[in-house]
Amino acid sequence: MVTTWPKNFPGVGTTAEKIAQSINKASDGRLEIKVYGAGEIVPAYEVFDAVRQGTAEMGHGWSGYWISKNPGLAYFGGIPGGLSPSEQSAWAL
């Protein structure tokens, strides 16, 4: 998983590692996810393209970074009155 933040960056930078650990645990180790911080494989703002092109299998970032690729991503990037994190997770499922 490539991310848009440095590894261990407080808050959002540690979330990717927590997600990876949760998936590893939930799959009993069948799925092993290694987290790469911004710049380790691709620059921060190239995470979306890296996943789309197959350079990385997963990406973790803020959808607002990629509004130019799809304006609909703005709805998931923090618009006031938009979905809460819980609502967004429920919608995605």
Regions found by a protein language model. Give the residues of each.
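Extracytoplasmic "Venus flytrap"
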Residues: 1-17, 38-42
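Contiguous mixed-secondary-structure segments that line small-molecule binding/active-site clefts
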Residues: 17-24, 52, 57, 62-93
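Structural recognition of the beta-strand scaffold that forms the well-ordered cores
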Residues: 1, 33-35, 57-61
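A broad, structure-centric signal for solvent-exposed, well-ordered loop/edge residues
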Residues: 8, 42-43, 48, 83-86, ...
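Acidic helix-start/capping segments at beta-turn-to-alpha-helix junctions
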Residues: 36-50, 74
